[in-house]
């Protein structure tokens, strides 16, 4: 895929780490990296409009193949003119393969060489997803960046199981490449798996790099391992990937994990974290996490985060946000979601500047001293 519609341009390497400043060029525009991608599971980033996403600096969003396949259906979206037109988003879109959702949401899974049979979590009907079908759905969706269909072994599964799993994922990746109908306007990434085993990650990366994908995803992390274990896997995995292609760490959204991923050479991240926790009143601030629903904020007439200049922090107080959330008002969720997304997008903007200034390690130290550091590795 050397004539891929997805191009990575390296602008600068940070002197003291593996971090890199760059940009990714797609058919729907160019975005700077490192970048956090908000997740629009059902073709919408929950409670946020496309205009708000652009306002907060989101250069690309992610949508979920599994959910859109089940509802409203990829063929309907194709008839609407593709996902960009359907959801009125004219900037880049990345879609996952549906694999992770099949393994985490669906019941009664049965994995064979052909693909995965499972029960639809909405109505219980029996369904089948193969590498070819995953590509076909994404071709219908028309995303700029698509993912290969992979198996997602858990981090602590036995070596022999993980070895068989990555070998199958490599065969599935090859099948997906052959099934890809739109290589001229949709890039396709391979997904490196291998749990915590360095030799299996090496084997997986070697297989996929030989297939010349548009970019490479690092899967199977942020699934229960410690922060230290995730960093160790990233330390050796990013070294196995080509410098002229994008690197995407899947499902990671905790601020300290984003910075640590960038330090190890990752360009792209996604996670439902900012909008999911916002719905419960949990907000990311420069001083750490804050649960604005708590009683202590009932008469706190200060901004959510005095150091933040987002729409929420410029206009509303903690007391008002608490009132909205306690009253189950949707506007409260809109405001906390906006803030959390802005916080992560602004963090990545600061990280990009720190790479430019060659002081990313100092920035990390300063950030973690105020925000805190999550050793467990849980996305929070």
From Swiss-Prot:
InterPro entries (UniProt xref): ArchSynthase1/Queuine_TRR, TGT, TGT-like_sf, tRNA_ribo_trans-like
GO molecular function: metal ion binding; tRNA-guanosine(34) queuine transglycosylase activity
Binding-site positions, substrate: 96-100, 150, 193, 220
Residues binding Zn(2+), per UniProt: 308, 310, 313, 339
Keyword Glycosyltransferase: yes
Cofactor dependency: Zn(2+)
Pathway(s) it belongs to: tRNA modification; tRNA-queuosine biosynthesis
One GO term of the biological process aspect: tRNA wobble guanine modification
Pfam families: TGT
Residues the record marks as active site: 96, 270
Protein EC: 2.4.2.29
Region ranges (RNA binding): 251-257, 275-279
Enzyme class: transferase
Reactions accelerated catalytically: 7-aminomethyl-7-carbaguanine + guanosine(34) in tRNA = 7-aminomethyl-7-carbaguanosine(34) in tRNA + guanine
Keyword tags: Glycosyltransferase, Metal-binding, Queuosine biosynthesis, Transferase, tRNA processing, Zinc
A single GO cellular-component term on record: cytosol
Cofactor note: Binds 1 zinc ion per subunit.
Gene3D superfamilies: Queuine tRNA-ribosyltransferase-like
Family as reported in the entry's similarity comment: Belongs to the queuine tRNA-ribosyltransferase family.
Protein purpose: Catalyzes the base-exchange of a guanine (G) residue with the queuine precursor 7-aminomethyl-7-deazaguanine (PreQ1) at position 34 (anticodon wobble position) in tRNAs with GU(N) anticodons (tRNA-Asp, -Asn, -His and -Tyr). Catalysis occurs through a double-displacement mechanism. The nucleophile active site attacks the C1' of nucleotide 34 to detach the guanine base from the RNA, forming a covalent enzyme-RNA intermediate. The proton acceptor active site deprotonates the incoming PreQ1, allowing a nucleophilic attack on the C1' of the ribose to form the product.
Subunit-level organization: Homodimer. Within each dimer, one monomer is responsible for RNA recognition and catalysis, while the other monomer binds to the replacement base PreQ1.
NCBIfam families: Q_tRNA_tgt, tgt_general
Name used for this protein in its record: Queuine tRNA-ribosyltransferase
Protein's organism: Streptococcus pneumoniae (strain 70585)
Lineage, top ranks: Bacteria, Bacillati, Bacillota, Bacilli, Lactobacillales
